[in-house]
Amino acid sequence: MNALPLLQLFALDCPDPLALADFYARVTGLEVEALGDFPPEEVTWIELLNGDHPTLAFQKVDHYVAPTWPEGPLPQQAHLDFWVDDLDQGEVHVLGVGATKTDFQPGDTFRVFLDPVGHPFCLVLHAAAPEGGLASG
């Protein structure tokens, strides 16, 4: 079992997830996940897939304000999700290297932390980790 996190996907906040997913699908050649019968106007989260695996996600944020880059009053913002074989081991690891666990934990299969400068990231339980851990898969 590997206690080190493995990057699951990268999520970007945005005002229109479908539009931004379409843009990045065209940039990368990756596929936007199928909506099925889900109404496009209600999409608040959508992922780009590399085969069966998500790689990028786009999350709707009401009143989204674009960052000013490379300098300006609103720095660039994003969050990362990392797969782990075991949430407890992953937590010990990230706390040991300087992360802070947030008081609010909204789910059972993931945990939210802050990096040393306050950006949120999640450790997500990888339910189907390959035998021998994620590093072997």
Labelled PLM ranges:
Residues 77, 99-119:
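A short, hydrophobic/aromatic-rich structural module that often spans a beta strand
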Residues 68-70, 101-102, 133-134:
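A short, polar/proline- and glycine-enriched secondary-structure boundary/capping micro-motif
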Residues 2-5, 11-56, 89-92, 96, ...:
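Core segments of cupin and vicinal oxygen chelate
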Residues 128-137:
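A short, polar/charged loop-to-alpha-helix boundary motif
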Residues 71-94:
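Mid-chain, well-packed structural core segment of small domains
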Residues 31-74, 116, 120-127:
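Conserved short beta-strand elements that form part of the metal-binding/catalytic scaffold
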Residues 1-2, 70:
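A detector for short, charged/polar N-terminal pre-domain segments
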Residues 13, 83, 107:
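Charged, low-complexity surface patches
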